[in-house]
């Protein structure tokens, strides 16, 4: 877990003296790192008692075709390009903005699998 807070150092290099310790609500969570595989999801409690569905593995994506206006559930074959990190292509990690190869062709992921629990994509070829 990582604390998503202010830096301990000032711009001059000095240290801020903490007025209090960390709170549970201020601690972030580890990235979901969604892979290609048989569907596996995890439900985690978030701030305010709400739930967040994290996709750990996904096999299918809902791909929309802008020309015809229809959406189909299509199997994901592989990750071809990922602007977030070149290593994600080798590891076949699914993130928002990644370009995936499917049975219909190439598509760009528009949803956030680690936050939404589903993979929505737009056909680009």
UniProtKB/Swiss-Prot annotation:
The keyword Ribosomal protein applies. Residues 1-34 are annotated as: Disordered. InterPro entries: Ribosomal_eS8 (IPR001047), Ribosomal_eS8_CS (IPR018283), Ribosomal_protein_eS8_arc (IPR020919), Ribosomal_Se8/biogenesis_NSA2 (IPR022309). One of its GO terms (biological process) is translation. Transmembrane segments: none annotated. Keywords: Ribonucleoprotein, Ribosomal protein. GO terms for cellular component: ribonucleoprotein complex; ribosome. GO terms for molecular function: structural constituent of ribosome. It comes from the Archaea. Belongs to the eukaryotic ribosomal protein eS8 family. Part of the 30S ribosomal subunit. PANTHER family: 40S RIBOSOMAL PROTEIN S8. This is Small ribosomal subunit protein eS8.
